[in-house]
Amino acid sequence: MAQQETEDARVRDGYAARAIEYTELFGDIAQMDDVDRERIGRWADGVDGRILDVGCGPGHWTAFLVERGADAEGIDLVPDFIAGASARFPHISYRTASLADSDIPLGSLGGVLAWYSLIHATPDGLPHLLEAARRGIREGGHLLVGFFDGADGQPFPHAVTTAHYWSVLGMSNQLERAGFSVLDSETRVQDGRRAHASISAVAI
């Protein structure tokens, strides 16, 4: 628990220092890739029940889900992100929390969206976060996780704070150990940037 609190503090402080800049660069759904919008939209349309947007940042993906008719809430470690999201989208529920200690009632969620919000988890910390997601999702509920595709657990210098690559196979194995069954995955590389990946899974 102490290790997770230390990691949470590292991520929180890193994003808090750049919250305004981050929101300007990435805080509008119109700035997001069409592929991401389609992927998340299709996934959300198949979720029955409440969706928790974990690491919601500026709140734009939570708003996207709500606009599609989903019952969605956003949580984030960074109070400035939550304050900004609540101001921009006052009709949506946002709160400051981490996945590890968000007090999600057991089996209360239809789905969890973890869109690049687990990339800063260490290889030792990731299983605990996936297990926390599984506890919150009822059997048959869904998880969608986005991440950077690469060698399993390899750290890289993300612009905010250290992040970690995972291969589709490696992340799939992590998900299966946490109590999920993988439904599908996708990968892509654009403009010479880091490779991206996502996995959709169901709680079993």
Stretches with model-predicted labels:
Residues 52, 58-101:
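Class I SAM-dependent methyltransferase SAM/SAH-binding core
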Residues 110-125:
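A short SAM/SAH-binding and catalytic strip from SAM-dependent methyltransferases
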Residues 140-147:
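Conserved beta-strand signature within the Rossmann-like core of class I S-adenosyl-L-methionine
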Residues 154-170:
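Acceptor-substrate binding/catalytic loop of class I
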Residues 189-204:
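Core SAM-dependent methyltransferase catalytic element
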Residues 1-47, 151:
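Conserved class I S-adenosyl-L-methionine
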Residues 127-139:
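A short glycine-rich, Lys/Arg-flanked "PGG" loop and its adjoining helix->strand segment in the class I
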Residues 100-112:
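A short acidic, Gly/Pro-enriched loop at the edge of an enzyme's catalytic core
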